[in-house]
Amino acid sequence: MKSVFVRRFLIAAAILFIWFIIHTTVVIIDGLNDELKPVDAAVVLGNKVETNGQPADRLKARLDRSVELYKENYYRFIIVSGGIGKEGFDEAEVMKAYLVDKGIPEDNIIEDNNGYNSYMTAQNTSKIMKDLNLNSVMIITQYFHISRTKLAFSKMDIKDVYSAHAKIFDFRDIYSIIREFPAYYKYLLK
């Protein structure tokens, strides 16, 4: 009896592990294959702001990627989405200031100050798109985060969603990639 239970447990664990490997491979490939198409707006998802009020490296990489593609005329508007982090800074305000310093016209930057997670960013972006009659967006975030973010946007009935990943890789990505597995299915079941 005990060996049957152990064998079933090991089979289930092996299936889950294989599923994780396949899912993670698909997420990484999807995230690293940018879908660059002219769109109405980019959506830059927030991330940590340092205690000195400057964007952390991951957030800088996202913002720099948005500037690069803006200057290549991929979109007119940049939606910066974030909340107030534990450091006490409004991510969207910090992001906007960074973009203005990089030469993006202030009128072309739209703040979403309630993007506390990817799902809320998708909800808020959907409303912004309706209000401004925008039809297409390009998500800009870390490569491992793109599949789940596209899922959230599709749940908000946003059809034309493309993506570009921030050009930064670090050791913490291992944790983030592992975290994306349960997070993706949490969003799928929302």
Residue positions per predicted region:
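N-terminal membrane-anchoring alpha-helices
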Residues: 1-40
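Short, Lys/Arg-enriched, disordered terminal segments
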Residues: 1-10, 74, 101, 189-190
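Short alpha-helical segments used as structural interaction elements across diverse proteins
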Residues: 4-5, 59, 145, 183
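Enrichment for repetitive, rod-forming helical segments
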Residues: 14-15, 69, 186
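A structural signal for short, hydrophobic/glycine-enriched beta-strand patches
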Residues: 24-177
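A transmembrane-helix-recognition feature enriched in membrane-embedded lipid enzymes
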Residues: 173-189
